[in-house]
């Protein structure tokens, strides 16, 4: 992940779908030292770290993993983005 909030050309905001296989990004949820702070929003996920979970037509897909993640995230209520 780069400092501008992109991972392999994927802007880390928008509509996100959780999948069990072949994700765009493998994500590990952590409580400290995340790569990205994520705020779950119900609409307008326009800023880095704002994710709206959907069942179809995602901007990108994620898979939750316990090891070897592409990025580590922490769910927050405020101040989403790169810590």
Provide a role label for each language-model segment.
Residues 1-83:
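Repetitive, compositionally biased segments used for assembly/scaffolding
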């Amino acid at each position: 992940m780069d400092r501008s909030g992109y991972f392999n050309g994927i802007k880390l905001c928008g509509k996100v779908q959780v999948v069990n296989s072949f994700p765009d990004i493998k994500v590990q949820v952590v409580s400290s030292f995340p790569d990205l702070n994520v705020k779950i929003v119900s609409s307008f996920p326009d800023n880095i770290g704002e994710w709206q979970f959907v069942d179809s037509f995602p901007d990108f897909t994620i898979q939750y993993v316990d090891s070897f993640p592409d990025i580590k995230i922490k769910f927050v209520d405020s101040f989403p983005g790169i810590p």
